[in-house]
Swiss-Prot record:
This is Lanosterol 14-alpha demethylase. CDD domains: CYP51-like (cd11042). It is found in: Membrane. InterPro entries: CYP450_sterol_14alpha_dmase (IPR050529), Cyt_P450 (IPR001128), Cyt_P450_E_grp-IV (IPR002403), Cyt_P450_sf (IPR036396). It is an enzyme of class 1 (oxidoreductase). GO terms for biological process: sterol biosynthetic process. Its EC number is 1.14.14.154. It comes from Pichia kudriavzevii. Sterol 14alpha-demethylase that plays a critical role in the third module of ergosterol biosynthesis pathway, being ergosterol the major sterol component in fungal membranes that participates in a variety of functions. The third module or late pathway involves the ergosterol synthesis itself through consecutive reactions that mainly occur in the endoplasmic reticulum (ER) membrane. In filamentous fungi, during the initial step of this module, lanosterol (lanosta-8,24-dien-3beta-ol) can be metabolized to eburicol. One of its GO terms (molecular function) is heme binding. Belongs to the cytochrome P450 family. Its main location: membrane. Pathway: Steroid biosynthesis; zymosterol biosynthesis; zymosterol from lanosterol: step 1/6.
Length: 414
């Protein structure tokens, strides 16, 4: 269909769409998405082609700004030059160090216990994990990142506002930043309410007269000066706070929900994990949970890895081509103005890289770990031996890898 192209089938079943196209055309092919030409390169070589592309050849900002700016706000993430985004990530990372995570663990535990005591009764029952994990993640993230002052203002309705923001990421939003439709109105209202809440928190911090080193807000207020000497405005700080919390909340709530759903279908795995936690915290869980304890839970971390492999939060990553771009080892040239697209989620579900790829098998990571600790599993090329740890064990920074749950390259998740 002209203009619409493959938007419907791609939007409904992206991985099946990619596989059908691959069988007909190979790993490199193009399709029309609501008037935009998308050139797809599947597999690790595609990851390397797009994620290691030069800034002069492709632009994440041009690809995403009309989608992300109404959600996050102006002046941050993709509504600014790339060098500013890199600086913003550095500002935020001050509060995302190992030392910070050590401090966050008891806060997260306290929030989870409060949530359980308030919402669950007895020894058994049912819950909607999509709802509970969204709320729980918001409460734990806001408490640890933004402090008690913000956490005390939040209730379940705040999770609904973040859900309204999240619904601003659709193929329709990719083409039209603003339309007179209910989901657009809810997105904009949620952005305004959340932004005003964060601005109020910033003003309260400043009025106190002393900026400490307790949370992300303190870190941003103390460190948000760009290398050219300009300082982020309070509105930009509030917008960056939306982006940081939303990025973590979206990923963590979805992943933890899938984690629990898979546990529900595997009683034996439940028992194994229960015994592993007992081995670390004591038979009656008498020890206080610490950050170091979490690193000892090999099966828990393998289950997280396997959950992310089967359920990557984003099915597509794309860039806008800003200069005619040759595709390596082919005769193809992607013209300026078109888009390049990769799908690490598709690769992680491919039998070419993971035997029995559609099956949930956390113990597959036991075997993978036996090879250089599982760090560079399948990774090739630049940075293959360099690592990053998202909290469930080290993985390679190399982008030519079949396992990229959080993307890679300069736009890799923090």
């Amino acid at each position: 269909m002209p203009w619409v192209g493959s938007a419907v089938v791609y939007g409904m079943q992206p991985y099946e769409f990619f596989e059908n196209c691959r069988k007909q055309h190979g790993d490199v092919f193009s399709f029309l998405l609501l008037g935009k030409v998308m050139t797809v390169y599947l597999g690790p070589k595609g990851h390397e082609f797009v994620l290691n592309a030069k800034l002069s050849d492709v632009s994440a900002e041009d690809a995403y700004t009309h989608l992300t700016t109404p959600v996050f706000g102006k002046g941050v993430i993709y509504d600014c030059p790339n060098w500013k985004l890199m600086e913003q990530k550095k500002f935020a990372k001050v509060a995302l160090t190992k030392e910070s995570f050590i401090r966050y663990v008891p806060l997260i535990k306290d929030e989870m216990l409060k949530y359980f005591n308030a919402n669950f009764r007895g020894d058994s029952g049912k819950t909607d994990v999509l709802k509970s994990q969204s709320e729980m993640t918001l409460f734990t993230a806001s408490r640890s990142l933004f402090g008690d002052a913000l956490r005390n203002r939040l209730d379940a309705s705040y999770a609904e506002m973040y859900s309204d923001l999240d619904k601003g990421f659709t193929p329709l939003n990719f083409v039209f930043s603003y339309l007179p439709l209910p989901n657009y109105w809810k997105r904009d209202a949620a952005h305004k309410n959340i932004s005003n809440t964060y601005l109020d928190l910033i003003n309260t911090k400043r009025a106190g007269g002393e900026i400490k080193n307790e949370d992300l807000v303190d870190a941003l207020l103390k460190n948000s000066v760009y290398k050219d000497g300009t300082r982020m405005t309070d509105e930009e700080l509030a917008h960056l706070m939306i982006g940081v919390l939303m990025g973590g909340q979206h990923t963590s709530s979805a992943t933890s929900a899938w984690f629990l759903l898979h546990l529900g279908e595997k009683p034996q795995l439940q028992e194994e994990i229960y015994r592993e936690i007992q081995s670390v915290l004591g038979e009656n869980f008498e020890r206080e949970l610490t950050y170091d304890d979490l690193q000892k839970l090999d099966l828990v971390n393998a289950t997280i890895k396997e959950t992310l492999r089967l359920h990557m939060p984003l099915h597509s990553i794309f860039r806008k081509v800003t200069r005619d771009l040759p595709v390596p080892n082919t005769s193809y040239i992607v013209p300026k103005g078109h888009y390049v697209l990769i799908s690490p989620g598709y690769t992680m579900l491919s039998e070419r890289y993971f035997p029995n790829a559609s099956e949930f098998q956390p113990h597959r990571w036991d075997e993978i770990k036996s090879i250089d600790g599982g760090i560079s599993f399948g990774a090739e090329g630049e940075n293959a031996k360099e690592t990053v740890d998202y909290g469930f064990g080290k993985i390679s920074k190399g982008v030519a890898s079949p396992y990229l749950p959080f993307g890679g390259g300069r736009h890799r998740c923090t």
